Amino acid sequence: METLGLAEGVENALSASLLLSIPVWASLGAERFDRIEIPSRIKRLVLLADNDRAGRRAVTKALRSYALPEREIIVLWPAVPFNDWNDMLRAGGKVRLGWERNAA
């Protein structure tokens, strides 16, 4: 299954990619999080917004924008107490999901 992650900023995209072992694009801000053109071949989209008010709003919009009948959309948040994926990576955080090894 072709998988793609979407994070807000460049640093968070790189950090999430390292943590999850999947390709991650940056939207360059919460206000653009639902406006990225995701290729239709992406069957699993992982939304990786910041864990703050703007990030939660961005995810709500993105869920509507990116929905396709054949696409699975997963929302992941940085572990508490981290606000974003870069903070989590720098603190030595780890993520174990199960599907990350099969990601394209």
Language-model region placement:
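TOPRIM fold recognition
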Residues: 1-4, 10-104
